[in-house]
Swiss-Prot record:
Keywords: Cytoplasm, Lipid A biosynthesis, Lipid biosynthesis, Lipid metabolism, Lyase. Belongs to the thioester dehydratase family. FabZ subfamily. It catalyses: a (3R)-hydroxyacyl-[ACP] = a (2E)-enoyl-[ACP] + H2O. It comes from Rhizobium etli (strain CIAT 652). GO terms for molecular function: (3R)-hydroxyacyl-[acyl-carrier-protein] dehydratase activity. This is 3-hydroxyacyl-[acyl-carrier-protein] dehydratase FabZ. One of its GO terms (cellular component) is cytoplasm. It is an enzyme of class 4 (lyase). Its main location: cytoplasm. GO terms for biological process: fatty acid biosynthetic process; lipid A biosynthetic process. The active site is at 58. InterPro entries: FabA_FabZ, FabZ, HotDog_dom_sf.
Amino acid sequence: MTEEATTTLSSADIIEIMKLLPHRYPFLMVDKIIEIDGDNAAIGIKNVTVNEPHFTGHFPESPIMPGVLLIEGMAQTAGAICAKKEGQPGNLVYFMTIENARFRKPVVPGDRVEFHVKKHKQRGNIWKFHCDAKVEGALVAEADIGAMIVRKDQA
Protein backbone atom coordinates (compact mmCIF):
# COMPACT_ATOMS: atom_id res chain seq x y z
CA MET A 1 0.00 0.00 0.00
CA THR A 2 1.35 3.40 -0.90
CA GLU A 3 1.83 6.32 1.50
CA GLU A 4 -0.89 8.20 -0.42
CA ALA A 5 -3.34 5.35 0.13
CA THR A 6 -2.76 5.24 3.89
CA THR A 7 -3.20 8.97 4.51
CA THR A 8 -6.18 9.85 2.32
CA LEU A 9 -9.84 9.06 2.61
CA SER A 10 -12.11 7.64 -0.10
CA SER A 11 -15.37 8.33 1.77
CA ALA A 12 -16.50 8.45 5.38
CA ASP A 13 -19.64 7.61 7.31
CA ILE A 14 -20.50 9.29 10.61
CA ILE A 15 -18.40 6.81 12.64
CA GLU A 16 -15.27 7.59 10.61
CA ILE A 17 -15.98 11.33 10.77
CA MET A 18 -16.22 11.15 14.57
CA LYS A 19 -12.80 9.45 14.65
CA LEU A 20 -11.34 12.36 12.64
CA LEU A 21 -13.11 15.31 14.29
CA PRO A 22 -13.71 16.15 17.97
CA HIS A 23 -17.17 17.66 17.26
CA ARG A 24 -20.32 15.96 18.58
CA TYR A 25 -24.05 16.63 18.53
CA PRO A 26 -25.37 19.26 18.34
CA PHE A 27 -22.27 20.77 16.71
CA LEU A 28 -21.24 18.02 14.28
CA MET A 29 -22.33 19.55 10.96
CA VAL A 30 -21.27 16.75 8.58
CA ASP A 31 -23.24 13.49 8.41
CA LYS A 32 -21.21 11.82 5.68
CA ILE A 33 -18.39 12.46 3.23
CA ILE A 34 -19.32 11.00 -0.15
CA GLU A 35 -16.46 11.92 -2.42
CA ILE A 36 -12.81 12.60 -1.76
CA ASP A 37 -9.96 13.38 -4.13
CA GLY A 38 -6.95 12.59 -1.94
CA ASP A 39 -6.15 15.66 0.14
CA ASN A 40 -7.28 18.01 -2.64
CA ALA A 41 -11.08 18.04 -2.46
CA ALA A 42 -14.12 16.51 -0.78
CA ILE A 43 -17.89 16.64 -0.67
CA GLY A 44 -19.51 16.49 2.76
CA ILE A 45 -23.23 16.00 3.36
CA LYS A 46 -25.50 17.57 5.98
CA ASN A 47 -29.13 16.44 6.15
CA VAL A 48 -30.99 19.37 7.70
CA THR A 49 -33.86 18.46 10.06
CA VAL A 50 -36.27 20.62 12.03
CA ASN A 51 -35.22 18.75 15.21
CA GLU A 52 -31.88 20.59 15.36
CA PRO A 53 -31.68 22.91 18.39
CA HIS A 54 -30.85 26.11 16.48
CA PHE A 55 -34.26 26.05 14.78
CA THR A 56 -35.96 26.69 18.14
CA GLY A 57 -34.93 30.33 17.92
CA HIS A 58 -33.83 30.83 14.30
CA PHE A 59 -36.73 31.39 13.41
CA PRO A 60 -39.68 29.50 14.98
CA GLU A 61 -42.25 30.54 12.36
CA SER A 62 -39.85 30.28 9.41
CA PRO A 63 -36.84 28.08 10.30
CA ILE A 64 -33.62 28.95 8.47
CA MET A 65 -30.24 27.32 9.12
CA PRO A 66 -27.83 29.98 10.45
CA GLY A 67 -25.17 30.89 7.89
CA VAL A 68 -22.42 30.43 10.45
CA LEU A 69 -23.38 26.74 10.67
CA LEU A 70 -22.99 26.41 6.90
CA ILE A 71 -19.47 27.82 7.30
CA GLU A 72 -18.87 25.36 10.14
CA GLY A 73 -19.96 22.46 7.91
CA MET A 74 -17.48 23.61 5.27
CA ALA A 75 -14.74 23.86 7.90
CA GLN A 76 -15.51 20.40 9.30
CA THR A 77 -15.41 18.83 5.82
CA ALA A 78 -12.02 20.49 5.25
CA GLY A 79 -10.92 19.43 8.73
CA ALA A 80 -11.63 15.78 7.96
CA ILE A 81 -9.30 15.99 4.94
CA CYS A 82 -6.56 17.59 7.06
CA ALA A 83 -6.96 15.17 9.97
CA LYS A 84 -6.80 12.09 7.74
CA LYS A 85 -3.84 13.40 5.73
CA GLU A 86 -1.83 14.22 8.86
CA GLY A 87 -2.63 10.73 10.13
CA GLN A 88 -1.44 11.27 13.70
CA PRO A 89 -3.81 10.64 16.59
CA GLY A 90 -4.05 13.53 19.01
CA ASN A 91 -3.91 16.30 16.41
CA LEU A 92 -6.62 18.97 16.22
CA VAL A 93 -7.67 21.05 13.23
CA TYR A 94 -8.34 24.68 14.15
CA PHE A 95 -10.44 26.95 11.96
CA MET A 96 -8.27 30.08 11.52
CA THR A 97 -9.62 32.40 8.84
CA ILE A 98 -12.70 33.12 6.79
CA GLU A 99 -12.70 35.34 3.74
CA ASN A 100 -15.13 36.16 0.94
CA ALA A 101 -18.13 34.59 2.72
CA ARG A 102 -21.37 34.95 0.80
CA PHE A 103 -24.82 33.59 1.61
CA ARG A 104 -26.94 33.19 -1.52
CA LYS A 105 -30.12 31.34 -0.51
CA PRO A 106 -31.71 30.16 2.74
CA VAL A 107 -31.28 26.56 3.88
CA VAL A 108 -34.36 25.07 5.54
CA PRO A 109 -35.36 21.79 7.22
CA GLY A 110 -35.59 19.02 4.65
CA ASP A 111 -32.66 20.30 2.61
CA ARG A 112 -29.61 18.14 1.90
CA VAL A 113 -26.57 20.42 1.91
CA GLU A 114 -23.44 19.41 -0.01
CA PHE A 115 -20.22 21.02 1.21
CA HIS A 116 -17.82 21.14 -1.77
CA VAL A 117 -14.33 21.79 -0.39
CA LYS A 118 -11.24 22.27 -2.55
CA LYS A 119 -7.70 22.79 -1.26
CA HIS A 120 -6.25 26.03 -2.55
CA LYS A 121 -2.80 25.62 -0.97
CA GLN A 122 -0.92 24.08 1.93
CA ARG A 123 2.24 25.21 3.62
CA GLY A 124 3.42 23.18 6.62
CA ASN A 125 0.53 22.84 9.04
CA ILE A 126 -1.50 25.67 7.42
CA TRP A 127 -4.18 24.75 4.86
CA LYS A 128 -6.35 27.04 2.68
CA PHE A 129 -9.61 25.93 1.05
CA HIS A 130 -12.32 27.31 -1.23
CA CYS A 131 -15.74 26.03 -0.18
CA ASP A 132 -19.21 26.02 -1.72
CA ALA A 133 -22.42 24.87 -0.04
CA LYS A 134 -25.08 23.61 -2.45
CA VAL A 135 -28.66 22.40 -2.19
CA GLU A 136 -29.98 20.47 -5.20
CA GLY A 137 -27.07 21.84 -7.23
CA ALA A 138 -27.82 25.49 -6.40
CA LEU A 139 -25.16 27.55 -4.63
CA VAL A 140 -26.42 28.61 -1.18
CA ALA A 141 -23.15 29.80 0.41
CA GLU A 142 -19.43 30.09 -0.32
CA ALA A 143 -16.26 31.06 1.53
CA ASP A 144 -12.48 30.77 1.58
CA ILE A 145 -11.27 29.30 4.85
CA GLY A 146 -7.95 28.61 6.53
CA ALA A 147 -7.13 25.84 8.99
CA MET A 148 -4.17 24.88 11.16
CA ILE A 149 -3.12 21.45 12.44
CA VAL A 150 -2.12 21.59 16.12
CA ARG A 151 -0.91 18.78 18.35
CA LYS A 152 -3.50 18.20 21.06
CA ASP A 153 -0.86 18.43 23.81
CA GLN A 154 0.13 21.90 22.50
CA ALA A 155 -3.43 23.27 22.22
